[in-house]
Regions:
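Extended aliphatic helical segments
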Residues: 14-15, 24-27, 53, 71, ...
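A short, structured beta-strand/loop element
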Residues: 29-57
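Short N-terminal "domain-start" leader segments
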Residues: 2-40
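Sparse, context-dependent recognition of short Cys/His-centered cofactor- or disulfide-binding micro-motifs
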Residues: 10, 20-22, 57, 88-91
């Protein structure tokens, strides 16, 4: 599949676009922004619960920056596609904690589904180790 960086977004003309991974972009406009994932990339990379948080527009699944972008970021970090941010602002562990607090506040249904999914994965891993 050929991916293309967006020039336009649901929030306006894209003035900055950073590729998070093929088909997934962090975009900024003059006044807003978010995460844009091409539909086929979103279906491959994001859980159904995460996909339900985003909204479709222009061939992308979109997650606005204030409340919903953290869903896409958490999914990409959980799968190891992107690393948690560490820099002069975020020390190790702080970025993930910030993302998790945002999810718990703005997307509690997604947070609960994620926690349940992680519990099931941990139980399966434990069972495999015991064999």
């Amino acid at each position: 599949m050929m991916y293309r960086e967006p020039n336009d977004s649901p929030w306006g003309l894209v003035v900055r676009c950073d590729t998070l991974c093929p088909g997934v972009y962090s975009v900024s406009t003059a006044g807003h922004g978010g995460i844009m994932a091409q539909i086929d990339a979103a279906r491959q990379l994001l859980s159904l619960e995460a996909q339900q948080v985003g909204f479709q527009a222009g061939g992308y699944l979109n997650f606005e920056e204030d409340c919903d972008a953290s869903v896409a970021l958490r999914e990409l970090m959980d799968s190891g596609i992107i690393a948690p941010r560490t820099d002069n602002y975020f020390r190790p562990g702080e970025y993930e904690a910030c993302i998790d607090r945002s999810l718990q506040r703005w997307n509690p249904a997604y947070w609960r589904a994620r926690q349940k999914r992680l519990s099931v994965q941990a139980a399966k891993a434990t069972k495999e180790r015991e064999r």
